[in-house]
UniProtKB/Swiss-Prot annotation:
InterPro entries: Aliph_Amidase/BUP, C-N_Hydrolase, C-N_Hydrolase_sf. The modification Phosphoserine is found at residue 378. This is Beta-ureidopropionase. Keywords: Allosteric enzyme, Cytoplasm, Hydrolase, Phosphoprotein. Gene3D superfamilies: Carbon-nitrogen hydrolase. Belongs to the carbon-nitrogen hydrolase superfamily. BUP family. The lineage of its organism: Eukaryota, Metazoa, Chordata, Craniata, Vertebrata. Pathway: Amino-acid biosynthesis; beta-alanine biosynthesis. Homodimer, homotetramer, homooctamer; can also form higher homooligomers.
Length: 393
């Protein structure tokens, strides 16, 4: 596995390939080339001073006679935790708020309309430890918790929709915990929330020790800038999860994540891009950065030695379009903001071209899936009938 010193696939290719070969490799890896955004000089300067990467790209679409371009800019934020996990909870939250506020200010300079933060962005990703305290103290109300109020101020100040994934404390239902994304309108009002539908039990990802599968289905949020959905982390491995957000009308699906190199880095460039193609929508995959060390050792249930960290979060956030093209990723080892301009008309244009929704045969799969979930289901496997088999000789 590549270590944190290896910055990005893009940098490696650009360093070692001749220009003509590089162009062909990028054509295959990334599809139709995206346009570089001309970002404001003051934004680039602020990002440099605040020590985070700032990149900008744009997807185009064919000009139409009856519809104006539907242009929206999204901002994906990837970041490491600024304080040690042993620091007091309130101090860690405050430091993360400060870091995100600085990045959001730069996003506003770049004209971002919708900004999305990484999974459980206001805390360390401590679910590997299986310890309850102090990690459950990071949980907040989705409706009026400290982090939601902070994001409401950002949204109103910058006229920006905010997608804020947090550890939710549901006080209306016994104080249970959920892995939740809060969606805040550019007016500053909480539009609603969505919860992680699929919970991993893989290696150190011991999340079901804290929360279970979400119970809110696949809501899509009609914002001023387009219809958005949030497929949290592990849900990207489940094609039907993406499909249901698309069926409910999502034009942009965010995938805020916390995933490590040894487990999933080879899958990362494929899954969100696949989903964009299959569902005629834009997908936005973002991941945290760095290595988080915890005070107490924990084990993985694999016979290996106890350790203090989950692994290396490899960043590499990117956006994929319905035509299969994608942006280059942010780096593997640096905080960053990826600004991407989308023309939502491309969703319908690609739908008309490939017609996956028309040819999807949902009624057939609905019927067969309804049978498959029954306890007495018998798989439709055709076997050779030995009685009717022709005799030899």
């Amino acid at each position: 596995m590549a270590g944190p010193e290896w910055q990005s696939l893009e940098q490696c290719l650009e360093k070692h390939l001749p220009p003509d070969d590089l162009a062909q490799v990028k054509r295959i890896l990334y599809g139709k080339q995206t346009r570089n955004l001309d970002l404001p000089r003051e934004a680039l300067k602020a990002a440099s001073e605040r020590n985070f990467e700032l990149k900008g790209y744009a997807f185009g679409a064919a000009k139409e006679q009856q519809r104006c371009p539907q242009i929206v800019r999204v901002g994906l934020v990837q970041n490491r935790i600024p304080l040690p996990t042993s620091a007091p909870v309130a101090e860690q939250v405050s430091a993360l708020h400060k870091s995100i506020e600085e990045i959001a200010e730069v996003a506003a300079m770049c004209g971002v309309n919708i900004i999305c933060f990484q999974e459980a962005w206001n805390m360390p990703f401590a679910f590997c430890t299986r310890e309850k305290l102090p990690w459950t103290e990071f949980a907040e109300s989705a409706e009026d918790g400290l982090t939601t109020r902070f994001c409401q101020k950002l949204a109103k100040k910058h006229n920006m929709v905010v997608v804020s994934p947090i550890l939710e404390r549901d006080r209306e239902h016994g104080g249970v915990l959920w892995n939740t994304a809060v969606v805040i309108s550019n007016s500053g009002l909480v539009m609603g929330k969505t919860r992680k539908n699929h919970i991993p039990r893989v290696g150190d990802f011991n999340e079901s020790t804290y929360y279970m599968e979400g119970n809110l289905g696949h809501p899509v949020f009609q914002t001023q800038f387009g219809r958005i959905a949030v497929n949290i982390c592990y849900g990207r491995h489940h094609p039907l999860n993406w499909l249901m957000y698309s069926i409910n009308g999502a034009e942009i699906i965010f995938n805020p994540s916390a995933t490590i190199g040894e487990l999933s880095e080879s899958l990362w460039p494929i899954e969100a891009r696949n989903a964009a193609i299959a569902n005629h929508c834009f997908t936005c995959a973002l991941n945290r950065v760095g290595q988080e060390h915890f005070p107490n050792e924990f084990t993985s249930g694999d016979g290996k030695k106890a350790h203090h960290d989950l692994g290396y979060f490899y960043g590499s956030s990117y956006v994929a379009a319905p035509d299969g093209s994608r942006t280059p990723g942010l780096s593997r080892n640096q905080d960053g903001l990826l600004v991407t301009e989308l023309n939502l008309n491309l969703c319908q244009q690609i739908n008309d071209f490939w017609t996956f929704k028309m040819t999807g045969r949902l009624e057939m799969y609905a019927r067969e899936l309804a049978e498959a979930v029954k306890p007495n289901y018998s798989p439709n496997i055709v076997k050779e009938d030995l009685v009717l088999a022709p005799s030899s000789g």
